[in-house]
């Protein structure tokens, strides 16, 4: 299954047509999240009589799907280990997420060496996507879910440590391996148990890329620090302070001041990774 920068419904329709005309009995996705997302909806669309766009905007209509297998070549979306897919219809400037247990890959091959050739741009954008997935699950109003919080903080520290290494040493196995496994852990459900997850930043980025077809991770890197500043207030300062102290090793007893330092560290990190700021 081949796909675009942001997987398009036209690619899905083409894939569904091929499956139906050739009695295909499984779908193999070789690539990153865009390819895997496309493959998931192709697999579901092959078992549906209508337009596959119906399954994007109405996930409950997904009743079955062809078996899906993936070979991951880009660490970012975590699509290799979850039930989600995001598809765009540029003719309508719409980008929607869909989900179904039927679309979970039956098997995914994760070999870090397959990511050695990923460009600096995509490595940086992919790392930003991983970070955003973790933050979406981490910044919630649920208190005392310490196992999930510490797990999320560990995953974030992994991104902040190994992202720059992968940029400078693209064939560094440890960096690529840690980013690859972190991407899968970030969105497979492990860190959201017991949390009330709102998913604030991703929907905003979907609107941006629906109109401008920008790289998803770059859009997230632009939006994330701004969202953090918007969400920071007296009621949320404690959580952003935890983030600053436990992830960025900020030493400041004042929650609000510590929180602002953590946000500044995040913005500076994205800048050093070569990601756009506006």
Label for each model-derived stretch:
Residues 27-30, 69, 186-187:
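Short glycine-rich or small-residue beta-strand-to-loop segments that form or flank ligand, phosphate
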Residues 47-150, 238, 242:
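A glycine/threonine-rich phosphate-anchoring loop and its flanking beta-alpha core
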Residues 13-16, 35-49, 81-82:
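Short Gly/Thr/Asp-enriched flexible loops that form oxyanion-binding sites at enzyme active sites
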Residues 5-14:
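Structural motif
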Residues 137, 141-265:
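Active-site segments that bind and position negatively charged phosphate/pyrophosphate groups
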Residues 24-40, 73-79, 211-214:
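Glycine/serine-rich anion-binding loops at beta->alpha junctions
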Residues 1-2:
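Short, small-residue-biased leader/transition segments that mark boundaries at the very start
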């Amino acid at each position: 299954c081949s796909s675009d920068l942001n997987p398009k419904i036209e690619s899905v329709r083409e894939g569904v047509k091929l499956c139906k005309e050739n009695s295909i009995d499984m779908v193999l996705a070789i690539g990153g999240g865009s390819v895997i997302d496309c493959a998931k909806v192709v697999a579901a669309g092959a078992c549906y009589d209508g337009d596959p766009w119906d399954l994007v905007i109405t996930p409950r209509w997904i009743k079955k799907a062809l078996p899906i297998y993936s070979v991951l070549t880009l660490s970012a979306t975590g699509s290799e280990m979850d039930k989600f897919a995001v598809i765009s219809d540029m003719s309508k400037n719409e980008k929607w997420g869909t989900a179904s247990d039927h679309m979970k890959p039956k098997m995914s091959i994760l070999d870090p060496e397959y990511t050695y050739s990923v460009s600096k741009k995509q490595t940086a954008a992919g790392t930003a996507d991983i970070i955003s997935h973790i933050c979406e699950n981490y910044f919630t109003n649920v208190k005392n879910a310490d196992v999930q919080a510490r797990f999320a903080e560990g995953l974030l520290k992994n991104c902040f440590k190994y992202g720059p290494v992968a940029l400078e040493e693209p064939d560094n196995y440890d960096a690529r391996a840690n980013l690859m496994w972190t991407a899968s852990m970030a969105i497979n459900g492990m860190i959201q148990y017991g949390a009330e997850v709102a998913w604030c930043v991703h929907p905003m980025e979907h609107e941006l890329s629906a109109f401008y077809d920008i790289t998803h991770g770059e859009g997230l890197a632009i939006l994330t620090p701004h969202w953090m500043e918007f969400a920071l207030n007296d009621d949320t300062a404690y959580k952003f302070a935890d983030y600053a102290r436990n992830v960025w090793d900020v030493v400041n007893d004042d929650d609000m001041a510590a929180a602002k330092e953590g946000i500044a560290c995040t913005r500076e990190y994205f800048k050093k990774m070569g990601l756009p700021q506006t």
